[in-house]
């Protein structure tokens, strides 16, 4: 079973770049574009790791 990583970033290009690299290395990746989406994803299933944009806007 692969480790699951949640990428939280409002920049689609960054999410796609990081996601592609991680998937190529065998990780399962979920994405969220904002704070609210991130909370929904976390409530569905807690990821093993989260990569978070430190300047993420709430919303």
Region locations from a protein language model:
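Two-component/phosphorelay signaling modules centered on CheY-like receiver
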Residues: 12-30
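Non-catalytic signal-transmission and effector/linker regions of two-component phosphorelay proteins
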Residues: 1-6
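Residue-level marker of structural boundaries
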Residues: 23, 47-48, 59
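Conserved acidic carboxylate
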Residues: 9
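The short loop immediately C-terminal to the conserved phospho-acceptor aspartate in CheY-like receiver
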Residues: 55-57
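Redox-cofactor binding/interface segments in oxidoreductases and associated redox assembly factors
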Residues: 52
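Acidic, metal-coordinating helix/loop segments flanking the phosphotransfer/catalytic sites
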Residues: 31-49
